Swiss-Prot record:
GO CC terms, sorted: cilium; outer dynein arm; outer dynein arm docking complex
Main location per the UniProt record: cytoplasm
Gene designation per UniProt: Odad1
Coiled coil location: 11-156, 186-234, 303-380
Keyword check for Cytoplasm: yes
Transcription among keywords: no
Keyword terms: Cell projection, Cilium, Coiled coil, Cytoplasm, Cytoskeleton, Phosphoprotein
Tissue specificity annotation: Expressed in motile ciliated tissues.
Functional description taken from the UniProt entry: Component of the outer dynein arm-docking complex that mediates outer dynein arms (ODA) binding onto the doublet microtubule. Involved in mediating assembly of both ODAs and their axonemal docking complex onto ciliary microtubules.
Database matches in Pfam families: ODAD1_CC (PF21773)
Protein name, per record: Outer dynein arm-docking complex subunit 1
Lineage of producing organism: Eukaryota, Metazoa, Chordata, Craniata, Vertebrata
Source domain of life: Eukaryota
Annotated spans, Disordered: 496-552, 574-658
Length: 658
């Protein structure tokens, strides 16, 4: 029992000790942490930071009082402003109650209407400015389209030239490869020729040596043959020799003559003595040895001389061959030089021929250019004589002191429309005294009567659909110089044929003022113009309001005119009104609308787009500008017709404001 208690007590003590040790360890850790914080807080940097923070806190506390005072002042101002606002609200309320008088209401309505008119005028000016900019944008789009087409042509030409350059480079590469292979084959052939020549030279030298050896052997054999022949001849008995031999034998027998051996010995002794005197050597063996050496040396020299002679002969042959080769080379060079000179002469002739052709083409170009300039000048003169409207052309092309080549079609189309108008007016003036006004209007519009009172020749405007030659001109882009020149030349030929036909038929010519105006037919695209333009006796009514506005165009005097006629569109009812005055040959009528006029010059799409986007707005500013331009271009020979209303009173109908 005691043991159990002791164990329990010891266990409890141990647990308590462990807890105390754990608490001591935690306290020590906390102490170390606090000590670290104390050390950090007691550092110089912390003290400086604390001082800085204390100073900032003092400044903020001082500024807090000032800000509080300012806030109170602003609150006082807000309260004062609120009070003033309440006072003004009460004042406005009282004034609104007192503003029920009729005069004040009328005055305010007048001010509002004046403001509306000012805004409408501003809107009209902005609309006109916008229309002008649309026309300019259309011209710029056309010019951009032309530039795009030119760019496409340039790219096609550049692609073709690049393809040709690529083909030429491939051809040059093939030629260089073939020339390199030919040069390699030539070098190989030249090397083989050198080797064959060396072999031939060696074989020739060897054959020469063998020939010399054979010749030497042949000469030796010939000498041997002669020697043997001589020996054979000596062996044959000769009578004189026999006689001499007998005589010598007799002398020998008598003792009067020595034998041949003795004579030979004596002769040898004499010869040795002479040789000893000549050479200074008395020993016969030495003499024989020297003689053999001398013979060997002579034979060696003979061989050397023969070899030198053969080599000289070989060199002479080589020199002769080289001279022949040089002569042949000089001849080939002379022949090649002659061929090159002939080629140079032929090339020079070709160059001279091309230069002459280029000069002829340049002269022809200058002549054609002069003809084109003359045609442009005549077109300008015809444009001025016809008193065509130049305001639209100035708006489209800008103010220019010269006429470009691509502008000829525009000028001709304007002249054509002007001539159609003049022809219509002339036809109407011719028939106005011979038929009633309704019949005259029908005849002017190209309609035939059931029972015509007088047979008249119908005046047909130029056919703008197709040319007699079958050429069709597209208005997608302007004509080039060559196309324009061909069309003008064809039109001139047609004009000459028409003039000759007129001279043969003796028909009267159309005159405008005093000079004669020849009508040049220029093909246009898409539509044929009717006998009378759509502007004759037409009524230009507003789409939105239902009221019509009147535009007047004045022409000069005509030689064939019988009396004045004024045609204009009436009011909203649409009945035509004709007036006659005492002035001769002066007629005014409503011109073609701006949309149709722009459509005939290639800007129909732009004008239609502008009308469609306006949502029922029909702008007549361009028509008024056309009427002003036509009336001003008539000069001193015509006077403008009186307007139907004052120009200052710009209404909503004329502006097309809906």
């Amino acid at each position: 029992m005691m043991e159990l208690e002791r164990r329990a007590y010891s266990k409890e003590v141990h647990q308590r000790l462990r807890k105390q040790v754990e608490e001591i360890r935690q306290l020590e850790m906390l102490r170390a942490k606090l000590q670290t914080q104390i050390n950090v807080a007691q550092s110089q940097v912390k003290r400086l930071g604390d001082k800085k923070h204390l100073a900032e806190m003092e400044c903020l506390l001082k500024s807090r009082a000032q800000v509080q005072v300012e806030i109170e002042a602003l609150q006082e101002q807000n309260r004062a402003l609120d009070k003033q606002i309440q006072d003004w609200e009460t004042h406005v309320l009282t004034q609104s109650k007192e503003a029920s008088a009729p005069d004040l209401i009328m005055y305010q309505k007048m001010k509002i209407q004046r403001r509306i008119r000012i805004l409408e005028d501003q809107l009209d000016r902005v609309t006109c400015h916008f229309d002008i900019h649309l026309v300019r944008n259309a011209a710029l789009r056309e010019e951009l389209e032309l530039l795009r087409i030119e760019r496409g042509r340039y790219l096609n030409m550049d692609r073709k030239l690049k393809k040709e350059i690529h083909l030429l480079r491939e051809m040059v590469g093939a030629l260089s490869t073939s020339s390199t292979s030919a040069y390699t084959a030539r070098e190989e052939a030249k090397t083989k020729m050198g080797m064959l020549q060396e072999r031939a030279e060696k074989e020739l030298a060897q054959s020469d040596t063998e020939a010399q050896i054979l010749l030497r052997q042949i000469s030796h054999l010939e000498q041997l043959h002669r020697f043997l022949k001589l020996k054979n001849d000596e062996r044959q008995p000769d009578p004189r020799v026999v006689q001499k031999a007998e005589q010598r034998d007799w002398e020998v027998s008598e003792g009067l003559r020595k034998t041949s051996q003795e004579k030979l010995v004596l002769r040898y002794e004499d010869t040795l003595g002479k040789l000893a005197q000549l050479t200074g050597e008395s020993d016969p063996d030495l003499l024989v040895e020297k003689y053999l050496e001398l013979e060997e040396r002579n034979f060696a020299e003979f061989n050397f001389i023969n070899e030198q002679n053969s080599e000289i002969h070989h060199l002479q042959e080589e020199i002769k061959e080289m001279q022949e080769a040089l002569v042949s080379e000089h001849a080939s060079q002379d022949k090649q030089r002659m061929q090159q000179e002939q080629q140079c002469k032929m090339l020079q002739q070709d160059v001279d021929k091309m230069c002459s052709e280029s000069e002829q083409l340049e002269g022809r170009f200058q002549v054609l250019r002069g003809q084109l300039e003359k045609i442009k000048t005549d077109i300008q003169v015809l444009f001025d004589k016809a008193k065509c409207d130049s305001s639209v052309i100035k708006d489209l092309l800008g103010v220019k002191t010269y006429m470009r080549d691509r502008d000829i079609g525009l000028f001709l189309s304007t002249i054509e429309r002007r001539l159609v108008q003049l022809l219509t007016v002339q036809a109407f003036l011719q028939v106005q005294n011979l038929a009633p006004l309704a019949d005259a209007a029908l005849l002017a519009l190209g309609q035939s009567l059931q029972e015509p009172s007088k047979k008249t020749t119908p005046l047909k405007p130029p056919d703008t659909m197709e040319d007699s030659s079958g050429a069709v001109i597209k208005e997608d882009y302007p004509m080039s110089k060559e196309e324009l020149l061909s069309q003008v030349m064809k039109s001139l030929q047609l004009q000459d044929e028409e003039e000759s036909a007129k001279k043969l038929d003796s028909s009267p010519s159309l005159t405008l003022s005093s000079p004669q105006i020849s009508l040049v037919t220029v093909p246009k695209h898409s539509k044929k113009t009717s006998v009378v333009p759509e502007s004759i006796l037409s009524h230009k009514t507003n789409r939105g309001r239902g009221t019509g506005s009147v535009s007047h165009v004045t022409f000069g005097d005509s030689a064939s005119a019988a009396g004045p006629v004024a045609m204009a569109s009436a009011s909203a009812s649409g009945a035509p009104v004709s007036s006659r005055s005492s002035q001769g040959g002066r007629g005014g009528f409503k011109p073609t609308s701006s949309s149709s006029y722009l459509g005939s010059t290639g800007y129909l799409e732009t004008s239609r787009g502008r009308e469609s986007t306006a949502g029922g707005v029909h702008s007549q500013s361009m028509g008024s500008e056309l009427s002003r331009g036509l009336s001003s271009s008539s000069g001193h020979a015509s006077s403008p017709a009186p307007p139907s209303r004052p120009s200052s009173s710009t209404s909503k109908d004329s502006r097309g404001y809906n």
